[in-house]
Amino acid sequence: VNNGTKKDIYKAFTDLSKLTTTNDYVLIYYSGHGQIKAEQAYWIPTDGSENWGSGDWINIAEIDIFLTDIKAHHLAVLVDSCFVGSKFKGMNIIDSISMSDQSSEHYGKYLESALTLRSRSVLASGTTGQVSDTVKGTGHSKFALSILNQLNVFDKQSYPLDIQSMAVLMKGNF
């Protein structure tokens, strides 16, 4: 959904829950405004007003419910938005994964095993604070540029891409 309204985003999530099977791999990318009010995190769609309480913001708790309904074997959500990353339910702490874990001879076996398990991962540009906007001359945020750089690196690797590895490699780049 490009420049999605609240209705468009809800429809896209509903469609994903109907169309996906346990054999699917799904990537969701949200780039837009986010806000925290009353300790709740929100996505602000293109038709969202600046005023909280107008009913046109999307609570992250609602997104979590939509994600639960998507039947995909692996689901990754990349969020390039202020304030919302820490509010996703069951979010992993990436700091516990070190680069040495990735370079070990056991990493391939770890990935093989991980691919057999159903997964839900969220990688966000911000947790509870403001994140940077577009990098001059690129048309992309620092987060998006970091993702694109990592995709180029992983394209040349012999092992599959996983969100946890990507997060470790991106840490500190945006």
Protein language model regions, located:
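Short beta->alpha junction loops
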Residues: 1-7
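Residue-level detector of conserved, well-ordered beta-strand and adjacent loop positions
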Residues: 2, 44, 124
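Caspase-like (clan CD) cysteine peptidase catalytic core
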Residues: 7-31, 35-92, 158-167
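Active-site-proximal C-terminal subdomain of hydrolase catalytic domains
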Residues: 72-174
